[in-house]
Amino acid sequence: YARLYPTLGFHPVSLSPVPGRLFWQTLNESVWLVHTAVAYDCIYHTLSAKQRTTIEKNLFAPMADFIMDGMGDNHANNKTFNKMHNHATWATAAVGMIGFAMNREDYVNKALYGSDETGKRGGFIRQMDYLFSPDGYFTEGAYYQRYAIWPFVIFAQCIENKLPELEIFS
């Protein structure tokens, strides 16, 4: 993937206004990166410094940048990244988790507080405040909760481990 990703334009099947590169939509890129960030964290110390640099420089950083900002003239990803919607939750979880794995504070901050890092326009913290009712009901509905809740849980666990001062579960 580290050799392939830099060569990719938009996926040839363009069924989405938010197209991906590896997959037909950016949502799938985000889901893939969430799972891959977990795997990368597990094997990080088994890789040489050169391998880590190659993977991070050619795959993870460009993918995180793409998820946040898009590519070329298509900046729909930035709008999605800052939305109050499960697609944005997957995106912020992906960028934040790979940010933790790569020790990229800039990615973690954008994931937590939105592209502008103010928390006023987007970000995981804002999603936690707006996508759940006061009684804890997920606004997109129970019928969708199994898919949409997972990035909240896995990213919150990462936040709790890396930034316990945020008291994410409180």
Question: Where in the sequence are the language-model features?
Answer:
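Aromatic-lined, polymer-binding surfaces characteristic
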Residues: 1-170
